A protein has these predicted regions:
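Active-site nucleotide-sugar/metal-binding loop of Leloir-type enzymes
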Residues: 54-67
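Short beta-strand-to-loop acidic/aromatic patch adjacent to the donor-nucleotide binding site
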Residues: 65-76
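Conserved donor-nucleotide/metal-binding helix-loop-beta segment in metal-dependent transferases, i.e.
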Residues: 82-97
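Short beta-strand-to-loop element that shapes/binds the nucleotide-sugar donor at the catalytic cleft/hinge
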Residues: 98-112
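Short, acidic, metal-binding catalytic loop of nucleotide-sugar glycosyltransferases
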Residues: 24-35
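Donor nucleotide-sugar recognition loop
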Residues: 142-166, 170-180
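Active-site donor/metal-binding and catalytic loop motifs
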Residues: 174-193, 202
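A recurrent flexible, glycine/aromatic-enriched loop bordering the glycosyltransferase active site
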Residues: 117-136
Length: 234
């Protein structure tokens, strides 16, 4: 793929965390690329989170986006993060199908200060939850399939996709590009135990174990040899 400018889609499912979602949108800056935001109104239609991700990706693909960022509504960018991230991923081989930035929350007294930082800021990089903010190319779904929409309302869909990526022989890469994840601001307000158990049970049915270390009992969904890791049955 050539040099920028690229068309970049930013997919943000929003359930109940409106203030921080607005902060996230405020923080999303680009000087070198074209950015379009795709709000997924979970506050109106409570879809599984994975379905909201898929819908946002489809909208971005329809609009011709080259790269798609999927972000939790409790995350923040530095002003230069998106351009640096797109530039880095545009240089990767096709084997790197998903990339992520690194959390720099320990750098600041107040998380929102990241929006006033620049490339000379001495960030303290820390690994956080991988799928709180990720970037894929527009052809990601062709290589890895869509996110499994059976995880309802959420939980485990990220473990599922990470395992699928591994089974398919692809890789994930993290960059020293800054972002902040405030952490579980939306799911905190959900009734976790019952829903989380339900999603975990589905993961167990699908993969035969719940190790979550990229080594599960089954190598094909539901132990069905006619399926590939890209597949899931609604």
């Amino acid at each position: 793929m050539g040099n920028s400018p690229f068309k970049v889609g930013l997919v943000i499912p929003i359930l109940n965390n409106f203030d921080q979602a607005v902060d996230l949108i405020y923080s999303a800056k680009t000087k070198e690329n074209e950015l379009k935001v795709y709000i997924q109104p979970q506050y109106r239609y409570q879809l599984p989170l994975s379905q909201a991700w898929n819908n946002g990706m489809k909208q971005a693909i329809m609009d011709g986006c080259d790269y798609i960022i999927i972000a939790n509504d409790d995350t923040l960018f530095a002003p230069w993060s998106i351009d640096a991230w797109v530039s880095a991923m545009s240089k990767e081989s096709d084997n790197i199908v998903l990339t992520a930035p690194l959390h720099v929350g320990d750098t600041f007294d107040e998380p929102f200060e990241i929006v006033f930082s620049d490339e000379d800021t001495e960030y303290k990089y820390v690994e956080k939850e991988l799928f709180s903010m990720v970037m894929v190319r527009a052809d990601f779904w062709e290589k890895c399939g869509w996110f499994d929409e059976n995880f309802d309302p959420c939980w485990w869909e990220d473990n599922d996709m990470h395992y699928r990526i591994t089974l398919l022989g692809f890789n994930i890469k993290k960059y020293e590009i800054p972002y902040i994840h405030l952490g579980n601001q939306t799911t905190k307000k959900l009734t976790k135990p019952i829903n989380s158990i339900k999603s975990g049970e589905y993961y167990l049915k699908k993969w035969g174990s719940q190790n979550r270390n990229l080594i599960e009992r089954y190598k094909t969904p539901y132990n069905d040899s006619t399926l590939t890791p890209k597949d899931w049955i609604k």
